[in-house]
Amino acid sequence: MTNKIEHFGWLVSPYSAKTRAYLKYKQIPFNDVEPNIFHFYTKIQKAVGRIIMPTLKLPDGSWLQDSSHIIDEMELKYPSRSITPEGNNQVLVSLLFELYADEWLPMAALHYRWNIKAN
């Protein structure tokens, strides 16, 4: 068992980039694992029931999936350098930004990636 968090995520995944940036900002030691077919079926799917990115394996052997859930859980475990604003209004705006970025920006990214010939 490793004493570092294992971060399973693709380099091209915006959600994996979100959790990777979060872990770096919080200065939480982790191993960044770009998963392969072996990881999918022998680790990730067995642990969480499906193949999904990003996924974290914690040092205690537990697993977390979904970028927002990962960040919420990690904020509880590592409260220093919090990403949560102090005021209620700022919290609301922060959550709205997260909702927009998680649900709407990937559609724009896919559009620009696949509908512009130069890309």
Please annotate each region the language model reported:
Residues 1-119:
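GST-like domain detector, emphasizing the conserved glutathione-binding G-site
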